């Protein structure tokens, strides 16, 4: 049983590397920018199309591998009722990951293409206009993604999982918050831009690793 769980967590970590790698591919570069949207930078303007293609392609195995690990976590919930709620929240929350990824990649691909084909002067207003028009997608998709993690925190803090209650404070959202604070201390650089864009994947690597290590040591 534990070997299957470890395999599932390793799938999750691999999924994070796929998804997070795509996040880095689509952002890593010079941070200089002249518009209102800080990630429409000189670096993203010069990123070749193959990097955006690869970033999108990696998202598909990434989300499948994420799903394997996230669904496996439900086996740690004690009661069937809570297990089913977690299951459906998880299924509901996985779809927006791809939608949000696609939203950013489409804008960045257009921005890069316009800068490379003689439309550089129009690239910023066009892409900022597109972002402004569809920016409502961001809170909607994030609002769909987060409930499963909030519910997991509730389950752990109330003792409804096999983990001790203190492990609620290793929740992926708290890890994300800690890493977000860390980015505020980083100098402005391509590394910071890539790290910030991949923050959720990096947080989930740590989360999966913590659970895998704890379960291995508690056997």
Locate each region found by the language model.
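Hydrophobic, aromatic-enriched alpha-helical segments typical of multi-pass transmembrane helices
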Residues: 1-219
């Amino acid at each position: 049983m534990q070997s299957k769980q470890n395999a599932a967590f390793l799938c999750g970590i691999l999924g994070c590397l796929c998804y997070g790698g795509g996040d880095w591919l689509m952002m890593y570069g010079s941070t200089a920018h002249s518009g209102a949207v800080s990630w429409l930078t000189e670096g993203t303007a010069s990123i070749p199309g193959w990097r955006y293609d690869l970033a999108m392609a990696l998202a598909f195995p990434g989300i499948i591998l994420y799903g394997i690990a996230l669904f496996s976590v439900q086996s740690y919930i004690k009661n069937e009722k809570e297990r089913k709620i977690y299951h459906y929240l998880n299924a509901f929350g996985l779809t927006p990951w791809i939608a949000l990824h696609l939203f950013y990649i489409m804008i960045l691909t257009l921005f890069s293409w316009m800068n490379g084909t003689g439309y550089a002067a129009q690239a910023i207003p066009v892409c900022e206009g597109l972002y402004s028009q569809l920016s409502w997608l961001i809170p909607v998709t994030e609002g769909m993604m987060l409930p499963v993690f909030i519910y997991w925190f509730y389950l752990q803090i109330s003792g409804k999982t096999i983990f001790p209650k203190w492990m609620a404070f290793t929740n992926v959202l708290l890890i994300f918050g800690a890493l977000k604070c860390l980015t505020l201390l980083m100098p402005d650089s391509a590394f910071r831009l890539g790290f910030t864009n991949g923050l959720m994947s990096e947080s989930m690597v740590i989360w999966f690793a913590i659970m895998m290590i704890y379960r291995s040591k508690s056997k």
